[in-house]
Regions:
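A short core secondary-structure module
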Residues: 5-49
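Residue-level signal for inorganic ion chemistry
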Residues: 6, 39, 64, 103, ...
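Residue-level preference for beta-strand/loop junctions
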Residues: 16-18, 58, 128, 165
Length: 172
């Protein structure tokens, strides 16, 4: 049994989680890979206080305070960094895929608006400046799609370039 003390900020969907995987430092210094330990804590355990935070982007997050909350070891003590690296890379890629879907929906709605909204008796999509903007948006989306699909393939293949691809999806 491990006792966890400290806080975690902006935990996505933390207010609806039954179990919390808490990244803790059990030895070493800040910045060291060794000494990071993963602990599983019940969200309703004594010493756990969850406060929901409404985010501007409509994501649900929470701030979680741990005051001697008891939890169970996940994996090996002090060896959680390798598991954490893979998990965070996968999360970055999957969030990028989610955001790509959202931006594609926005683009489809934009194109529909360009086709239906009229100004001076013609659809505004016939205006050259708006055509250029739509073309630029399309190119950016296609580039992002290419990066996300490549990153998803790297995730499926457990590629050595997974971390690099995850970083690239964040940049796009």
């Amino acid at each position: 049994v491990y006792k966890v003390t400290g806080s975690k900020k902006f935990v996505l969907d933390g207010h609806v989680a039954n179990k919390l995987i808490v990244v803790t430092r059990t030895s070493g210094n800040a910045g060291d890979r060794d000494g990071i330990t993963l602990v599983l804590v019940d969200s309703d355990a004594a010493g756990v206080e969850v406060t929901r935070t409404i985010m501007a982007d409509s994501r649900n997050a929470s701030n979680i305070e741990f005051s001697g909350a008891e939890g169970q070891l996940l994996g090996e003590e002090g060896k959680g960094a390798n598991v954490l690296d893979y998990t965070l890379d996968a999360g970055r890629i999957l969030i990028a895929a989610e955001m790509l879907g959202s931006v594609e929906e926005c683009f489809e709605r934009t194109v529909e608006y360009l086709k239906t909204r009229e100004q001076f008796g013609v659809p505004i999509g016939s205006f050259q400046a708006l055509k250029h903007r739509a073309a630029q948006m399309f190119c950016e989306i296609e580039l992002s799609k290419s990066v996300v699909l490549e990153a998803l393939s790297a995730l499926d293949d457990d590629s050595d370039q997974l971390a690099e691809m995850a970083s690239l999806t964040k940049a796009r």
